[in-house]
């Protein structure tokens, strides 16, 4: 990398964890580890059924998405790999995306969108 990075990573916004059974994930992350359950989200297009949980307070809140596939045989396979993705707070997202693509970084086929 020859040029300076033109953006700053401000923090972690989310961590997405996949498995074949989100109830088992929830039993560990909510019941044992104490994360707060927020709400559920389901999308046939994204092949995902997830529980959205949180840890931390205020500016230090991190979303933890516990995801299972609606159909394990279809793509995307949200359970493979188990650590599916992380979300970062970035000070200049359009600049970051353009620069990272120039560095050869690939993004999800669905693109970058708010809350994902």
Model regions and ranges:
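Short hydrophobic beta-strand elements that form part
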Residues: 16-17, 88
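Short amphipathic alpha-helical segments
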Residues: 11-15, 82-84
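Short, recurring structural edge motifs at helix starts
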Residues: 4, 74-75
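Mid-chain, well-packed structural core segment of small domains
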Residues: 75-105
